[in-house]
Amino acid sequence: MSTDWKDLPVAPWLIDTMEQFGFTDMTPVQASVIPMFAGNKDVIVEAVTGSGKTIAFLVPLIQRMLNLLKEGPAVSGRVYSVVVSPTRELARQTYEVLQSILEMGCPEADASDKITLEKKKKGKAAPTMPKKIRGQLIMGGDLPSHMDLKNFLRDKPQIIVATPGRLLELLRAPQIKTSAFDSLVLDEADRLLDLGFGRDITSIINILPKQRRTGLFSATITDAIQNLVKIGLRNPVKIVVKVGGKKEQKTPLSLGLSYVVLEPREKLAYALNLLSIYPYRKAIVYLPTCAAVTYYQQMFSHLNEGREEPYEIYGLHGKLPSSTRIKILNKYQKTGAQAILMTTDIAARGLDIPEVDLVVQLDPPSDADTFQHRCGRAGRAGRQGQAIVLLHKGREEEYVDLMRVRKVKLRPYTGPGSELEGEKLDQEATELYTKLRKWVLEDRQRHDQALLSFVSFVRFYSKHVAQSIFRIQSLDLPGLAASYGLLRLPKMPELRTKDNERPENTWLGEVIDFDTYSYKNPAKEEARLKELEAHKEAMKNKVKIHKTKNDVQKANRAWSSTLQKKEEKSERHQKKQTRINEKIKRDFEEAKDLKQEESKEVVNDWKDMVKKSKKRKVDLPTFDDL
């Protein structure tokens, strides 16, 4: 199998563009897929993350559209080819790659078009050709659906990159015609199904004509995907690209996978040291929850202020508006400075961010597939990368064996930053908590965010898929809470089994008066003080009302009723005492009778014994009688 771009059956300008992008040779997945998909084959492609799948389907799509344009210009309202992406971020990224290819190399007309040249020689009018192949991005949260339709009818794009829901809306519009449809690509197909788009994908497939080419691209092929293949593809060629020809390998050879075992209180100090020492251009730090991303971004920004060469820090999670997420991702991708992206699993799959050298997972994800996709953000397209997961001492060390079963081999980390261990690491963790505690005490809002982040982590951890490894009962919760900068442990149902290990009164250090612990924000502080005053007043009124109610009950009680109750109580007491006395007397009489009977029996026994003794003396012979 040749990996030379010049051996591909595609337009010369496409080959030149790939070389200008710096792709001197094709990756294995590109060399396998492009000739098949550019021809007339449906393909199912299973390849490791970071293997160059995006180029593997965009190049054939562009070539197929070039072939279609030889037959005539694009017609308004006709859909020619579609790339379906599971998320808006991935759709936008795919569209930007497509636009980069088209803008860099796509000519205004194919000068090698034999039909055009022949017609020009014969003096006939050449077919009207579009200036260039066009693409359109269609997704929710960007433009209203009616604007997407308007732009589509006006621009006549040949390649659409879309998310499932918005694409389905477009295809159902009466102005849309699919009779000339050529190619469908399902990118990250397993995730399309995982996110619940199965019904939309089935509807899209049913709307499009059966006479088409379909490419299904995914890192894993599941049973659900096999069912999709049955209804969506015709005699597909399955292409499984293994790295280095090793069946057991699930990640690129250019990507190093490592782990570090730490105490919970040491984790933050180790991560900070690693991000300060490791030589990376861009790094991604994965956190388990949205609340953790918000809090850690602020915390790292504060701790970053004292560095001689501070790095840029960005935060990305699913609770941010789509437009905000896109802006943050664009800034992170385009920055020329050393940068860190703190994110959840929203950025674990599909995103092809250039120059990512380091991935740090502060906690393992809830499933093994996500772990691989997280790691795959580094070491893409042959670039060297390093992925490190931080594990707690104890049960979590078994995670290494779990990943080995999933054909992912993790090795102890020995690179830059690994020398921080033992007493030195413990000292760093102690000093960091002191700094963090001081920072948290400056603004109550920070403690609120730390608390929310810690609580969300505990709930995430308690619902982990691998319950035999990730058990909340085995976790050092005070140490973990200290790494979040908490002042005391919160009261949570998940922490009830850890009561014996809590510090006195749940405080992790010096006791803080929360009544005087204030917000920096004047509006929030004013609201807090009002709420505190209202609470104190309510507590006073509650006690006062309670006392008053008792007093009223006593005051309203009649004297005769009180006397009657006293008499009834006295009578009950006398009756009870009488019963007790009678019982004592009865027990005494019974004991006396029993004693008398026993005495009589003893006397009778002695009389019988004397009689028997006398009789025995009479019966026995004397010595003289012998």
UniProtKB/Swiss-Prot annotation:
Q: Look at the named UniProt entry and state the broad enzyme category this protein falls under.
A: hydrolase
Which GO terms label this protein's molecular function in UniProt?
Answer: ATP binding; hydrolase activity; RNA binding; RNA helicase activity
Q: Name one GO cellular component term.
A: nucleolus
Residue span of motif Q motif:
3-31
Q: Which residues form the Helicase ATP-binding domain?
A: 34-239
Stored InterPro entries: CTT_SPB4, DEAD/DEAH_box_helicase_dom, Helicase_ATP-bd, Helicase_C-like, P-loop_NTPase, RNA-helicase_DEAD-box_CS, RNA_helicase_DEAD_Q_motif, SPB4-like_CTE
Q: Which PANTHER family match?
A: RNA HELICASE
Question: In its UniProt entry, what is this protein called?
Answer: ATP-dependent rRNA helicase SPB4
Q: Which organism is it from?
A: Yarrowia lipolytica (strain CLIB 122 / E 150) (Yeast)
